[in-house]
Amino acid sequence: MAKALYTARAHVTGGRINGHGRTSDGALDVALRVPKELGGEDDGTNPEQLFAVGYASCFESALATVARRMKEDTGDVAVESAVMLLPTEERGFKIAVELDVSLPSIEDAAKAVELVRAAHRVCPYSNATRGNIDVALTANGQPLD
């Protein structure tokens, strides 16, 4: 394994049902709960929400990196993410992700798609999930294959 550039550490007790999660530096300190849609009381966050924020922020940073390399000014980029919890045939669960990337200063649809594809190749979350979960991407409203 390559030398780590950064290591994040967290401690969780109680899981997603009635849990608590905290990063080692205290920057994140959250109650973990079952989503209201699944019978929870909606008084905390859940792993899917945390994954949605993490993936979207990581993807936006990856996009900024590839845009800089390609000498493109992307302006105010926004990434909307959706993380869906799905059942599996084995009575387990899996997730799927949708990332809707808005690049308002990139009017050329082909260029927007090229940037999003390039970001998907370098994003650590994309690399970690590739081949394991379904990830649907859109660039300025245009779905990518």
Please report, for each region that a protein language model flagged, where it lies by residue.
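Extended beta-strand/beta-hairpin segments
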Residues: M1-V53, E60-D145
